[in-house]
Amino acid sequence: PKNIHKAIDIIVKGKSAPIDSFRVNNHFACMLSGIGLDATIAHRFAEQKRRGLLTYIRISALSFLKTGAYPVSIKTNTDNIIQTDIRFVSIANSNQFGNHVTIAPGASLHDGLLDIVVVQKRNRLLTVMSVLIQILFGKIKPVASASNQKKTILYFQSKEINIENPNLAPLHIDGEPIETAKQIHINITPSALLMIQPL
């Protein structure tokens, strides 16, 4: 909670429970990581002298209109391979996307799994509509395979993924811009932290 008195009350009276974390090329991550459009926004927002919601909306709109697609190959721990051009890929450990938006509604800090959302290259109007539908009604779907990529959004779970990123799509970890790489390895660390929670 933002209220300091409520926060202190939870610290004093709450209970600790284990939560998962994950690693992105050996960098610690807790909530959400991504490559592509959302990372582009994170990098550009970090460069701004003025912060705040209006700046974030402006940067997001400009980035959406100007950022192209990136070719990637994603391999899961079950050896499924997805080869596609993406607007962005989000790797979620929790369902919070930012500003109370949930891109991965089924994500949990306690299940030992990463939720991966792959937004493929489509026309911009279809992308917006598909992302909004995912935010409002999204559910976990079966792991997508290379032969099943007709939908704009692919949504699946995995303990580990490897992303080939030949065109160096930008990368962020928990909203912070990070130097990208052509090979990105991401894996879950179950019950890595203790977090104080309300009773």
Where does each model-flagged region fall?
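Catalytic core of DAGKc-family lipid kinases
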Residues: 1-87
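Short, solvent-exposed secondary-structure boundary motifs
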Residues: 8-14, 98, 152, 173-178
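Short hydrophobic-aromatic micro-motifs
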Residues: 27-33, 82-84, 88-93, 97-99, ...
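Short acidic/glycine-rich loop or secondary-structure boundary segments that cap or lie
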Residues: 38-41, 82-84, 97-100, 124-128
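Gly/Ser/Thr-rich active-site loops/lids in small-molecule metabolic enzymes
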Residues: 47-55, 105-127
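Oxyanion-binding "anion nests"
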Residues: 68-113, 158
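ATP/nucleoside-binding phosphotransfer catalytic cores, i.e., glycine-rich phosphate-binding loops
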Residues: 76-78, 83, 108, 120-199
